[in-house]
Amino acid sequence: MTKVVLIRHGESVWNKENLFTGWADVTLSEKGIEEAKAGGAELKKAGFTFDKAYTSTLTRAIKTLNLVLEEMGLLWIPVDKCWQLNERHYGALQGLNKSQTAEKYGEDQVKIWRRSYDTPPPALEKSDERYPGHDPRYKNLSEKELPLTECLKDTVARVVPFWENVILPDIKAGKKIIIAAHGNSLRALVKYLDNISDADITELNIPTGMPLVYELDDNFKAVNKQYLGDPEAVKKAMEAVANQGKKK
């Protein structure tokens, strides 16, 4: 049985402030640093090791991965930083407070923007400083690849081919892989691995800093998954993520 580990970055400073983050590049909070270290400790305790790691081009995921690998004594393994694993782009919502946005537009609308499969938030203008085309890390991407906004369906459209064409060949070659990414890029991957319907994906929330272990069968299809750590703590963390888009 093949195993692959997914981990959402630890709490970021914008998670702490309950802001829509998307492709905005913010760092980890103190709590997020501790979450990442704890995730690494859980993996080490459970006897995991890795040959290669994948993460996004965003600081919060890269730092999380480094902290996990440091806890495990694995900072030396190769790491690929890939924009395809970035968080979904939240468009014109990036930088706005989720609770205040719920006050303005209503909780139902914010839940649709946050959790629906195919309804994107309002788009950015290309002149907006938040447009990824202004960021040097994306200078090699085509205009078509640079989002003005994204729904989860758009995120699936970049994450799943990356899994199939880049990550899965490494797994098939026998490499032990860890992926450190984001709430929605991981929701996109989990949707694919677990064959979750467009409707049911609305209720899926992924907690920060908690390793999610997938078991794959001989055909590299997911047959089991489990969070490492205390089940009650996992449940509470999922509920906290779900409540972020509600009015105060």
Curated annotation (Swiss-Prot):
Its EC number is 5.4.2.11. It comes from the Bacteria. InterPro entries: His_Pase_superF_clade-1, His_PPase_superfam, PG/BPGM_mutase_AS, Phosphogly_mut1. Belongs to the phosphoglycerate mutase family. BPG-dependent PGAM subfamily. GO terms for biological process: gluconeogenesis; glycolytic process. This is 2,3-bisphosphoglycerate-dependent phosphoglycerate mutase. One of its GO terms (molecular function) is phosphoglycerate mutase activity. The gene is gpmA. HAMAP family: PGAM_GpmA. It catalyses: (2R)-2-phosphoglycerate = (2R)-3-phosphoglycerate. The record marks H182 as: Transition state stabilizer. The keyword Acetylation does not apply. CDD domains: HP_PGM_like. NCBIfam families: pgm_1, PRK14115.1. Gene3D superfamilies: Phosphoglycerate mutase-like (3.40.50.1240). It comes from Brachyspira hyodysenteriae (strain ATCC 49526 / WA1). The active site is at H9 (tele-phosphohistidine intermediate), E87 (proton donor/acceptor). Transmembrane segments: none annotated. Substrate binds at residues 8-15, 21-22, 60, 87-90, 98, 114-115, 183-184. Pathway: Carbohydrate degradation; glycolysis; pyruvate from D-glyceraldehyde 3-phosphate: step 3/5. The keyword DNA-binding does not apply. Keywords: Gluconeogenesis, Glycolysis, Isomerase. Pfam families: His_Phos_1.
